[in-house]
Structures are given as structure tokens and as C-alpha cells.
Amino acid sequence: LFHRPTGIHRDVGILYLVSSLETILQLKGEKALFLDVSTGELGASLAYALRGKKNIRAVLVYPKGTVTGLSDEDFYWNGGNIYPIEVDGTIEDCNKLCRSIFDDENFVKPNRLTLANTVNIGRLLPQAFFYPFAFSRIKNKVHSDIVYALAAGNYSNVVAGLYAWQFALPLNGFVIPSHQALAADVMGNPLILDSIVPVKERDDTDSAHVSNLERLEDIFSANQL
């Protein structure tokens, strides 16, 4: 996964998302705008993916003095469709700013704002192909159960892996850290605290703090979307 343009796994999902969205927008004669908080990896990957794209722009918000991985060349190559905004504050200040913008539907819809993080299904689905690729590399070298160990993060990788499993990929499970929102009972079944509240009765998805717990609920039929 590090054999990508910027050397990070995010390139896989972001390149697919940007290319697909650019094609759709071109066919419809429309434009769209990414609004994301980034201090490095996401911004660098998005800047590379947007090179030469005519129908998509990106606003990257970051705390002053923290951004890495972006250079002047990124903006030259992109012909003016990357807009970096430096905020004199913390990463949480940046998140609050973006959250307040996405809360305003009257602004979001006419400007066709979207996100490049894994709340966007177009970014998440390509990650499902990580696991068949890994399986193709190890299937003849392993003669026992195959279990993937993953960092928790926002659970995007385990959701993508479970999608691959639902697509009939033969594997035996995932090992991920638990916390108060996601644990397991004595039988190993997932316990998702949020599942006691129907999805339609919850607050809107937080654009600043992406969580894929609702997708996990749907996979395990804890709370149908």
C-alpha cells in the first residue's frame, strides 16, 4: 500500500474517489468542493489526486505551522484548485470551523460540498480491496486461520474488511482494540453502545470526527440503516 504516489495507503481510496467524482461531474456538467481538515497525509494525497481535474476543488484547513507533506509545487500543478487555509488555532478549532459549515445545509447543497475522509462511501469502498490483495499474497504461505490485526482509528479499515468478507473473501476474523463505544461480550459478539438508539433518532454525522460505528451496526444487524 505504500507503493502509491505519496507513499500512504490513503492514496488508494482518494484516487478512486476523485477520479470517479470527476467523471460523474463531467457527465452532469457540475462541480464539487472538498472541505477537509488536514495537517499532512490527507492533504498531500488529495493534492496529488486533484492534479489536472477541472470539476473539483478542495479547501484544506489546517492549524498554523502544522501542515506537512504539501509543497508549493502541489499548488502549481493543480492550477488553482487547491485552497489552503491556515487557522490561528488548534486542530479542534479547525474541526469546529468545518463542522459549523457542514451544519448549514443552505450553504452545503448549492456549493456541493463533500468530504474526502471515510464518511464518504466513495473513499471507503476501495479499502475493501486491501484484503483480497493481502489474501492473494499469503494464501499459499499460510496453512491455518487468517486473522487481520488492525488499529482502531475510526473503524474504516475493519468496516472495509467486513465488506470484503461479505463479498465472499475467505478469512477468519479481525482483531481490533475496544473502547467504550465498541466492545465484546463473553461470547465474542460485538457490543455497540450506540445501537440502543435508533439511527433516525440520532444527531447528524459529525464531519469533524468521523466514525464508522453505524456501518458496523448495519453489518451485524444491530441497527439497520
Pin down the residues of each PLM region.
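PLP-dependent amino-acid enzyme catalytic core
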Residues: 1-225
